[in-house]
Regions:
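Hydrophobic alpha-helical segments
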Residues: 8, 22, 91, 220-222
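Small-residue-rich helix-interface/hinge motifs
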Residues: 2-74
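Alpha-helical transmembrane spans of integral membrane proteins, capturing the lipid-embedded, hydrophobic core
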Residues: 7-14, 91, 95, 99, ...
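PDZ peptide-recognition modules
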Residues: 70-85, 97-235
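Short N-terminal helix-initiation segments at or just after the protein's N-terminus
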Residues: 1-5, 114-117
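Residue-level signature of transmembrane alpha-helical entry/exit and packing/kink sites
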Residues: 2, 6, 82-91, 95
């Protein structure tokens, strides 16, 4: 049953992706020859206007055919003959639909949440190294660590893990004022937890109630972080 749900989810993702191309093409006045869900032999098809709608045997792909492979097509409504901005919009529409799908799925997953951890310092553990007069203080909201933007609480540990050493340049908000701290020493320390030795950076973060606005914000930045991760993986 798990495989069936996985196939259906993948088919939905493809449908939304190709549907994004299709909708953008129609809105831009670009000719769509075929809109198909699936690959391989045709199971069902129907032509409406200039477009053939088809369901194919293998639910592992799809296509929105706009004459993009025919360089000899002289129709001004063919994809290759459309204005550059129209082609850009059509190409971007597929990815945009997948992003929106991910946003909706995450929002549904976050819906039951009662609260979220924020990037605001609440307190320090005994061995925390980054406090003091020139370091972090309880109530500080972290904005950036070594150039890495902090949107969610998890971004702090990600940014700290990226550091080549334990000294960080940090932008934060303290008492409503934006501050820049240089060379803040934050190194993981060993702590005893339930009889085991574990490493922590040594600070606690505050939580906030999961209001509708907070859920939307956390969902948005979760999607942004996925995009950021993909971009970084390509570097």
């Amino acid at each position: 049953m798990t495989i069936v749900w996985a196939v259906l989810a993948f088919a939905l993702m493809i449908l939304l992706h190709e549907g994004g191309h299709f909708t953008a093409a129609k809105l831009c006045g670009v000719r769509v020859d075929e809109f198909a869900l699936g690959l391989g032999p045709v199971l069902l098809k129907k032509k409406a206007g200039e477009t053939t709608y088809a369901l194919r045997a293998l639910p592992f792909g799809g296509q929105c055919v706009m004459g993009e492979d025919d360089e000899t097509d002289t129709d001004p409504r063919a994809f290759l003959n459309a204005a550059a901005w129209k082609r850009a919009v059509i190409l971007a529409a597929g990815v945009t639909m997948n992003f929106l799908m991910g946003f909706v799925v995450l929002l549904c997953l976050y819906a039951p949440a009662q609260g979220f951890v924020t990037p605001t310092i609440d307190a320090f553990m005994e061995k925390f190294t980054g406090g003091g007069e020139t370091g972090l203080r309880p109530g500080d909201t972290i904005l950036e660590v070594d150039g890495y933007n902090v949107y969610l609480s998890t971004d702090i540990s990600t940014a700290l893990a990226k550091g080549r050493d334990a000294y960080y340049d940090i932008w934060l908000v303290r008492d409503g004022e934006k501050l820049h701290l240089e060379n803040v020493y934050i190194a993981p320390q060993e702590y005893e937890l339930n009889g085991e030795t574990v490493e922590y950076y040594g600070f606690y973060l505050r939580a906030e109630p999961a209001t509708a606005g907070v859920k939307l914000r956390v969902t948005w930045y979760s999607c942004v972080n996925v995009v950021r991760l993909v971009i970084e993986s390509l570097k």
